[in-house]
Amino acid sequence: MVNRRIAEILRSGQPDESLVVQGWVRTKRELKGFAFIEVNDGSSLGNLQVVINQDLPDYAVIVKQLNTGASVEVNGVLVASQGKGQRIELKAEAVKVYGEADPETYPLQKKRHSFEFLRTIGHLRSRTNSFGAVFRVRNACSAAIHQFFQERGFLWVHTPIITASDCEGAGELFSVTSLDLKQIPRTENQGIDYSQDFFAKPTYLTVSGQLEAEVMAMAFSNVYTFGPTFRAENSNTSRHLAEFWMVEPEMAFCDLEGDMDLAEAFLKHIFNHVLEKCPEDMEFFNQRIDNTVLATAENIINNQFERLTYTDAIKLLEKADVKFEYPVSWGLDLQSEHERYLAEQLFKKPVIVTDYPAQIKAFYMRLSDDEKTVRAMDVLAPKIGEIIGGSQREERLDVLERRVLAQGMQPEDLWWYLDLRRYGTVPHAGFGLGFERLVQFITGMGNIRDVIPFPRTPQNAEF
């Protein structure tokens, strides 16, 4: 017999097909002479109903084992369903129970559990409808990212997890060391003697693959990274993770206009792909989590993003008939409430803000001719605020050296990055997208800890 995934069976299975299904029991109902179980294998939101007649060998023993959470293999034949709610069902000819789940102790029963409770059983929460849908959408987003860039001739490059550089200059880094923490070697002035460490210098978990991606773009023109990044930011909020995934394309011979065009096309592609591949899951989110997710997706796909400068954005915010918690003034960074006002209330669609003050942006962003602003851009989305941050990079060696020094960094630490401007420099641009924030935005999930399988947050590193 053919082993089939339940998603495929529900989509195209026909009566009289003989097949094998493997999965986990979601529910059981016993009636006189037979039992119904609903089996799910993670491939779809929907379950496959299995009918077990009492003439099955060891019927009573098997049915007693088929509690919620038990793992099973069912051999049988598809038949047209007599009941409502499903087109077909599986008439069991043989049932094998791989593993039982004691109903007295198994924490997932047939009721809705709060997300707070499910975070306490992270090893089991993927078996619920909500988290099954989240991680199928997360998978579809991942596939869409690779599809988008590969179709456009980008090279996927693997940038290092362990690095000696702080791309953002924020200092919120996790240190990597093999030194004995009980007996840390010291220099004469009582600093840490890194010469005895594994890499003979201070090293950290990466906060971004951007600088290394720029290296590769100077050889392959268009590249992208997609991998984990780390921030030792002690923020216990619904928007922050210590370990999260980033998508970072870099394009040689590209300016800010090209960067914005790519970012807009990129977001539209991902939303289109998810709606095509996960319609059932997206409908679930729209009904159970946030009744605007489908409308939001259509908004992203069907609207041209609004583009305006930071200076114009500040003027609009100053005129707004809204009392903001944080001040609005030229030279201050936009807060989430400002970003959401622009995207949600004013323009009612995604907004790209460009040309931010140089003093609030990173050293590598291209200085504008006025020397007050840089060629930066942020994509602001309704309901979430900033979803993408990017810029045209500074390709002029003398200007970049000035910017490095102005931000208190040492040029010798970035000698290799400066070399890119010495040998065959070109205008280039790129952006970064926080993957979990994207999944959160698409699904409507309220807490970022619920869109990654194993969240890493302050005081929490389970599994």
From Swiss-Prot:
Compartments (UniProt record): Cytoplasm
GO cellular component assignments: cytoplasm
Enzyme class: ligase
Catalytic activity reported: tRNA(Asn) + L-asparagine + ATP = L-asparaginyl-tRNA(Asn) + AMP + diphosphate + H(+)
Xref: Pfam families: tRNA-synt_2, tRNA_anti-codon
CDD domains assigned to the protein according to its UniProt record, in alphabetical order: AsxRS_core (cd00776), EcAsnRS_like_N (cd04318)
One MF annotation (Gene Ontology) recorded for this entry: nucleic acid binding
Xref: InterPro entries: Aa-tRNA-synt_II (IPR004364), aa-tRNA-synth_II (IPR006195), aa-tRNA-synth_II/BPL/LPL (IPR045864), Asn-tRNA-ligase (IPR004522), Asp/Asn-tRNA-synth_IIb (IPR002312), NA-bd_OB-fold (IPR012340), NA-bd_OB_tRNA (IPR004365)
EC number, as in UniProt: 6.1.1.22
Domain of life: Bacteria
Family statement drawn from the similarity comment of this UniProt entry: Belongs to the class-II aminoacyl-tRNA synthetase family.
Subunit structure and binding partners: Homodimer.
Protein name (Swiss-Prot/TrEMBL): Asparagine--tRNA ligase
Gene that encodes it: asnS
